[in-house]
UniProtKB/Swiss-Prot annotation:
One of its GO terms (molecular function) is molecular condensate scaffold activity. The gene is Rxrg. It comes from the Eukaryota. This is Retinoic acid receptor RXR-gamma. Residues 211-222 have a biased composition (Basic and acidic residues).
Amino acid sequence: MYGNYSHFMKFPTGFGGSPGHTGSTSMSPSVALPTGKPMDSHPSYTDTPVSAPRTLSAVGTPLNALGSPYRVITSAMGPPSGALAAPPGINLVAPPSSQLNVVNSVSSSEDIKPLPGLPGIGNMNYPSTSPGSLVKHICAICGDRSSGKHYGVYSCEGCKGFFKRTIRKDLIYTCRDNKDCLIDKRQRNRCQYCRYQKCLVMGMKREAVQEERQRSRERAESEAECASSSHEDMPVERILEAELAVEPKTESYGDMNVENSTNDPVTNICHAADKQLFTLVEWAKRIPHFSDLTLEDQVILLRAGWNELLIASFSHRSVSVQDGILLATGLHVHRSSAHSAGVGSIFDRVLTELVSKMKDMQMDKSELGCLRAIVLFNPDAKGLSNPSEVETLREKVYATLEAYTKQKYPEQPGRFAKLLLRLPALRSIGLKCLEHLFFFKLIGDTPIDSFLMEMLETPLQIT
């Protein structure tokens, strides 16, 4: 297309070669321009000398003069694949900057020709740093700082709340002046009529408030339905029945055979706990869905929580006792006896963190049963075959207890939280009791696993 290019043109002396040096090279046309008479369609090609061939990375091309991002791209790419090393005697070093003024001077972005595959300057998406792009929205009603778009208009929290209250309560305002009051950040509360009218003029939508209220109502109804479903699946009535079924008979407290009792409070407590283990299994069988679990999981749950379950029971039973605890056998263990037996510190914790708190809030039997059921359904017990099922049952008890407290004690909105706060104390005291061998005679020489397994396999005895 360019005729016969059998020779390459001469390089001028200023490029490091010897004067008049002539060399025939194998450099590609992208690096060196050939000589010879061009075709008529390319009149710009002449036999006059032109500047020496240069690689892209060797000269101050418009790309390199622009800096980031092109400099990063070209430096990462390296020299073009078509650029070859100069032959011996030719030094392809960039000429002084004075010789590149024509190359480096760029009058506009249109003069810049990017590399193939790279976008032009006009097409580059640079982050906007103009002052206008950093301006935050202001409230369209009063000019205060906007907290976002509310009911279709950028507005502050004050105007948002004012508009919502007006719509929800269907309020009607009047203006004392000419219905043209100035509404700005300082005077927005002076005239409610003009403020409301400006909300409407600026585009706030009444229907947006009504739709928001409808969504809130639907969400509340949905949550209520879910909670109701949980309550039906874990009725508090059955939990209360389980507590009442295993409650020691009050009249039996006075019939305790004194000859069988000892002066050692630890022995008395262990004896009472041994008796209570049988009723503990009966109680667990009456808790909804406990018997639906595998026999192995039932054993694991009782083994993990028996100490906390028994401590919760005698603590609640002792709320009417002065400075002591009442055992299921009818015996009273006083603080002085516990201190003399060397278990005073843990005994004091039971009285302070459990008995006293239960007494102050007047915890009833239903709440006690729910707390014990939460302890029973422990998904963290080691060895469970289906922890997720146990966790689901615990969550159902949570929902049942919360609904019960809201319905039974509406004047105490924090009661549910107060009840749950007793669980960490119960857990800590239970672990401390084991650490001190508080119930060291509980099972004697019988391993607890086989002991509980034998009781669980016994049919439920209705009393």
